């Protein structure tokens, strides 16, 4: 299986036949010694594992061939860190490697076997310091990657060291600037003396100001005045104003005449409407106000007038109809038997009954009127005419 990893032929392998060449050089800077027999094996691994014939020097020494085969098996295709390439004469090896089995070279010659075992002894001495047991820590930091200033700060806690506070661009008083935005106890505004405010501010000298004084100073550039300005007097009581015409000081509105002099509301309106100054006899001490009528009374009167007109309109129609019926009934009732004056009040009373809502026709009693038996046709014609007129009046209503 590992025959392809055989050592390649090298012109300098004959120089390593002597056991003296396996000794560690006193002035070498490498911590361990690598046998020259491994260098060709590593070169053959890096060259693509090409098969090559075994040289006659290694064929005569079966111990070296078995050692090279055992060493090459440690660097298989699945190894994550293949060895670096070195020249054939190099003596440096970058990492520690476990020694091979002691029985691998048992069949070799005495001189070759003792030389290989002697070469393994220096390697065993340097293998222990290079290996780091599990659970241990490094004794010192890496000076090539970590500067001395930062390495000293790593020994402290995550927030207690000088790294956090030594960063550039950070002010050491950022905590006080942050806390000044919150209301604190024992503070007093240097301008107005306020002890409580939603937001404490500072002026240019660092003194505390309340929110109102701080905003006033920020917007206007001066201190906030402590005395409140007096309220503006009303127009009716402005100091120093007097009407030029009537010399009054009480008015609801100050006006100006054509010359620009102040006048009261009454004198100004009189001059505007009439074109002449207001007479002094019309001056009043009290201000006259308008007597406005409430809107509810006007609405109530308007609604009552409309209801009256609506109720009067049906009666007018009924009266016209009744007058027409009376004018037609009077000539028919006039006869030589019945006197006229006695018939007129009766007809008017019947007309009033016909206007009532429950009576739709005229009723005549036979004992009130004496009609001859020889003339029944006029009475029958009168009743038919009265019924027709009553129906017409009902239809019109």
From Swiss-Prot:
Give the recorded effect for residue 187 to G: In CHTD5; decreased transcriptional activity
**What does the annotation give as the result of altering residue 207 to R?**
In CHTD5; decreased transcriptional activity
Zn finger intervals (GATA-type): 189-213, 243-267
Q: Where is the composition biased (Low complexity)?
A: 87-101, 310-335
Question: What cellular component GO annotations does this protein have?
Answer: chromatin; nucleoplasm; nucleus
According to the record, mutating residue 218 to T results in: In CHTD5; uncertain significance
Impact after mutating residue 252 to P = In CHTD5; decreased transcriptional activity
Asked whether the UniProt record includes Metal-binding among its keywords, one would answer: yes
Q: Which residues cross the membrane?
A: none
Q: From start to end residue, where is composition biased (Basic residues)?
A: 289-298
Positions with biased composition (Gly residues): 102-112
Location of the protein in the cell: Nucleus
- Explain what the record says happens when changing residue 190 to A: In CHTD5; uncertain significance
Q: Sorted alphabetically, which keywords does the UniProt record give?
A: Activator, Disease variant, DNA-binding, Metal-binding, Nucleus, Repeat, Transcription, Transcription regulation, Zinc, Zinc-finger
Residues covered by region (Disordered): 48-116, 281-356
Q: Name one GO molecular function term.
A: DNA-binding transcription factor activity, RNA polymerase II-specific
Q: Which GO terms describe its biological process?
A: aortic valve morphogenesis; cardiac muscle tissue development; cell fate commitment; cellular response to BMP stimulus; cellular response to hydrogen peroxide; cellular response to nitric oxide; endocardial cushion fusion; heart induction
Its biological purpose is as follows: Transcription factor required during cardiovascular development. Plays an important role in the transcriptional program(s) that underlies smooth muscle cell diversity. Binds to the functionally important CEF-1 nuclear protein binding site in the cardiac-specific slow/cardiac troponin C transcriptional enhancer.
Record disease entry: Congenital heart defects, multiple types, 5: A disorder characterized by congenital developmental abnormalities involving structures of the heart. Common defects include transposition of the great arteries, aortic stenosis, atrial septal defect, ventricular septal defect, pulmonic stenosis, patent ductus arteriosus, and tetralogy of Fallot. Some patients also have cardiac arrhythmias, which may be due to the anatomic defect itself or to surgical interventions. CHTD5 inheritance can be autosomal dominant or recessive.
Q: What is this protein called?
A: Transcription factor GATA-5
Gene name of the record: GATA5
